[in-house]
């Protein structure tokens, strides 16, 4: 039961950090490539 409580307290923190980092990455990509449907570094 203690392991379950530890998991339930760690998972929201990790997911908040992960989604915050992902949102920051998307914001920075949109800052350098605004309104891009295709990114120049993905086109071959």
UniProtKB/Swiss-Prot annotation:
Signal sequence interval, chain numbering: none
Role: May help in the organization of the PsaE and PsaF subunits.
Annotated protein name in UniProt: Photosystem I reaction center subunit IX
Family that this chain belongs to: Belongs to the PsaJ family.
Cross-referenced Pfam families: PSI_PsaJ
Its membrane topology: Single-pass membrane protein
Sorted UniProt keywords: Chloroplast, Membrane, Photosynthesis, Photosystem I, Plastid, Thylakoid, Transmembrane, Transmembrane helix
Subcellular location: Plastid, Chloroplast thylakoid membrane
GO cellular component, one term: chloroplast thylakoid membrane
Organism: Nicotiana sylvestris
